[in-house]
Regions:
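Long, C-terminal-biased catalytic regions of enzyme "large/alpha" subunits
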Residues: 1-482
Length: 482
């Protein structure tokens, strides 16, 4: 396929509203001399004050990223635990003490910079000796940083009851996220980003785009996936992120992230329920699944599979290590419409409500209507989980999947040891926000109930697409990644 034909195809699909670019990507396409199209990054801190990847270098790296509105995931597991004597008369203060510095950096740079919408997430492995201190840190000690525990099945099995209890309570109160420890095709560890949907090498960056399923007919899905992946890979070769001196080059960081939004809209437009779609997914994915499948639902599932396969083929032919990521996309979804003219719902989950009033100190009150989609309350936890597990299974089978910013529903589920065990053996890669989804239990501090720009950072939504706006509100956390 020639370049001119691809350009025409890109234009047609954009006009047809089926490719949803992040604000950063669109701005960079319009003006390559503007901010970089990548949105978040990762830094793995070595156990040394000095050196190219030491603690002081991490401060510079975090400062650089935040000043340009990016999100930074800071991985602290290599730092010695508090109280460790290095044999030269120096005693380590531990990773938690440095966590306060990253929080302070974020607070001050957001108050004084131009782009006040970066975010910091601190990561610590479950088997680190200071894990209890990390999990139990009061919010007021690190008010401008989130916390994520990285773990494996073995780590969880070996954790003490006291540690497990602290983590489960932290998840329930919204303080702690989880990310599975992940390795690339060569066995090298890769690290979760801010929103937990992308896994990177240290100093890697993420370049994201979405297929607007709500703008597609089933027969459009394959073309949308192919075009989205082709465009991302073309952009990947041109970003020039390594020129900053802080980030990996494209040759060393061969990954992009194509995701989805508007699934709820597509299902509603095709007259398919989430339950019918979940049965069709199971029927398609598992040979021994015995379901009475709705033809319209199976048609969407097969189109989705063909689209993923086509995009995976393009990514593999361009030597990409990873190529799919389902990000939190509330802000991006607000900018796009479905085939009926309604606002597209974020990512692949059912929305909490059909109507959203976004009260923004910058733009005033904006009203959004998702149309006649099913809501989370109507879909229910079991069906939601079956759908998102099924889609993640599709992506995982390509061996090119980063992950999904997977939200749990705190007013529906109970966070127990067994709940974590089930998550660990599922295709999910992270456990992001714990949301209240039932209409009669939503609270002001529900991270996804509304994107209110006056939220304290502790309760604000980290959504990959808000980085494209210059914000002038002191404590507005628009997001991090995408």
């Amino acid at each position: 396929m020639g370049f001119s034909h691809l350009q025409k195809l890109f234009t047609t699909l954009m006009e047809n509203n089926v490719i949803a670019r992040t604000g950063r990507v669109q701005s960079w396409i319009d003006d390559p001399n503007s901010r970089l199209p990548v949105s978040c990054t990762v830094f793995v801190v070595e156990d040394s004050m000095e050196g190219p990847n030491g603690i002081e270098a991490s401060w510079r790296f975090v400062s650089h990223a935040l000043r340009y509105g990016a999100g930074v995931a800071v991985h602290l597991s290599n730092i010695r635990p508090a109280g460790t004597d290095n044999g030269q008369g120096l005693v380590a203060s531990g990773p938690c003490s440095f966590g306060k510095i990253y929080s302070c950096l974020n607070e001050q740079l957001r108050r004084g910079g131009v782009y006040k919408n970066g975010a910091v997430v601190l990561h610590l492995d479950l088997n680190h000796p200071d894990i209890l201190e990390f999990v139990n840190m009061p919010r007021h000690e690190i008010p401008w940083a989130k916390r994520c525990v990285d773990l494996s099945n073995v780590m969880w099995d070996m954790a003490t009851p006291k540690v497990k209890k602290a983590i489960l309570e932290g998840i329930a109160r919204g303080d702690i996220w989880l990310a599975k420890i992940k390795r690339d095709q060569r066995g090298d560890r890769i690290y979760a980003n801010v929103c937990l949907e992308v896994f990177l090498k240290s100093r890697g960056t993420c370049l994201l785009e979405h297929v607007n399923l709500g703008g597609c007919r089933p027969e459009d899905i394959v073309g949308a996936f192919s075009t989205g992946m082709t465009e991302l890979i073309e952009l990947h070769a041109k970003t020039g992120v390594e020129k900053t001196g802080e980030y990996l080059s494209q040759e060393d960081d061969r990954q992009v992230g194509l995701g989805m939004l508007g699934l709820a809209n597509l299902l509603a437009l095709e007259g398919v329920t989430y339950s019918q779609f979940s049965d069709a997914l199971s029927h398609h994915l598992y040979a021994d699944a015995d379901y009475l499948v709705t033809p319209e639902a199976l048609k969407i599932v097969k189109a989705l599979q063909e689209g993923i396969d086509a995009a995976a083929s393009i990514a593999k032919s361009n030597n990409m290590d990873r190529a799919f990521a389902i990000a939190p996309t509330a802000s991006c979804s607000y900018r796009y419409k479905d085939r009926a003219g309604y606002t597209t719902a974020p990512e692949i989950a059912p929305p909490i409500g059909r109507l959203v009033d976004r009260d923004s100190s910058t733009f005033g009150v904006e009203h959004y209507d998702y149309g006649n989609v099913e809501t989370a309350d109507q879909v229910g936890w079991d069906v939601y989980k079956k759908v998102v597990d099924g889609i993640m299974e599709m992506l995982m089978r390509t061996n090119l999947c980063h992950g999904y910013s997977y939200n749990t529903w705190s007013d529906v589920v109970t966070y127990t040891d067994h709940f974590i065990d089930e998550w660990l053996v599922s295709p999910q890669t992270s456990m992001y926000y714990s949301l209240q989804v039932n209409q009669n239990t939503q609270a002001k501090d529900d991270a996804m109930a509304a994107l209110d720009e006056t939220y304290d950072f502790t309760f604000s939504d980290l959504d990959a697409d808000d980085n494209d706006v210059q914000i002038e509100v002191d404590n507005f956390c628009s997001t991090c990644a995408e």
